[in-house]
């Protein structure tokens, strides 16, 4: 009955959400497919490795938003690789884009969660962002990728290519699109933003209008950065705010717009 009503709660079991018919056959990708990085049996008790301050209310809101869209007949997930590509490389079956719809014809944000290049922490680090962006009219896509720096950038580049090629079908405008990410996801956004999709196996597509980065100690500056916004906390034990501040200053010295919020 819970699924038929398209309503989940903090007491809903993670296993039941992942197997819900509304999300079939991609519900498993709502949560880490790599073992050992998730604790908790319910949406309310869900915890992800390296993250704190996860909001059960936001987790429930994310799941219910996707469920409501699916119940209304909207497609909520798009594979980024063809069936033949996934057959040749089964790991590519664990990739794709969850679509949080904004306004028809509005710009696009692609949001990539962190996870230490080991797993995808989407329920903490990309789904909540995509939900809020969509509520503000932006068409937000949360990327599920293959962890590891190279494959992450390949998957993000493929996602950008997919969105450009299917923009009309999706009802989105790729002009002025942005790349968002936290932790490892922020590095993905920065690398693809700076080097372009052509550096990671795709043909050249327009660079993003902006890169939005959260809490990652990336220091490299190549002189090809898009306008960049960064934010980080002073008490972050993993990402150095000083490193992020120095990078922001270096981007500015190259004549590009860059801001940081500490």
Where are these regions (language model features)?
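Short beta-strand/loop motif that positions the catalytic acidic residue
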Residues: 229-232, 236
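Short amphipathic alpha-helix adjacent to the substrate-entry channel of hydrolases
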Residues: 122-141
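Primarily recognizes the serine-hydrolase "nucleophile elbow" in alpha/beta-hydrolase
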Residues: 154, 158-225
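N-terminal targeting or regulatory segments adjacent to alpha/beta-hydrolase or S9 domains
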Residues: 1-93
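Short alpha-helix in the alpha/beta-hydrolase fold that links the catalytic acid
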Residues: 226, 240-250
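Catalytic histidine neighborhood in serine/cysteine hydrolases
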Residues: 252-262
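A short loop-to-beta-strand scaffold at the N-terminal edge of the catalytic core in hydrolase folds
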Residues: 88-101, 107-108
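Short beta-strand element of the alpha/beta-hydrolase
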Residues: 106-115
């Amino acid at each position: 009955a819970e699924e038929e009503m398209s309503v989940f709660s903090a007491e809903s079991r993670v296993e039941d959400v992942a197997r819900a018919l509304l999300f079939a056959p991609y519900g498993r990708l709502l949560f880490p497919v790599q073992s050992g990085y998730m604790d908790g049996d319910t949406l309310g008790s869900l915890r992800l490795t390296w993250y704190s301050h996860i909001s059960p209310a936001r987790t429930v809101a994310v799941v219910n938003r996707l469920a409501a869209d699916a119940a209304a007949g909207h497609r909520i997930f798009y594979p980024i690789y063809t069936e033949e590509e996934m057959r040749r490389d089964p790991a590519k079956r664990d990739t794709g884009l969850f679509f949080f719809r904004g306004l028809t014809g509005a710009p696009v944000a692609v949001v990539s969660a962190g996870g230490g290049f080991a797993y995808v922490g989407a329920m903490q680090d990309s789904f909540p962002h995509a939900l809020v962006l969509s509520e503000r009219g932006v068409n937000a896509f949360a990327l599920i990728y293959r962890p590891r720096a190279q494959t992450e950038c390949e998957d993000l580049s493929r996602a950008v290519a997919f969105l450009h090629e299917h923009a009309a079908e999706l009802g989105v405008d790729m002009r002025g699109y942005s790349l968002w990410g936290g932790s490892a996801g922020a590095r993905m956004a920065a690398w693809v933003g700076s080097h372009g999709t052509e550096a990671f196996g795709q043909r050249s597509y327009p660079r993003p209008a902006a890169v939005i980065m959260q809490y990652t100690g990336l220091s490299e500056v190549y002189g090809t950065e898009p306008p960049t916004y960064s934010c980080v906390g002073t008490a972050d034990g993993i990402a150095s705010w000083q490193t992020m501040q120095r990078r922001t200053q270096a981007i500015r010295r190259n004549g590009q717009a860059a801001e940081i919020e500490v």
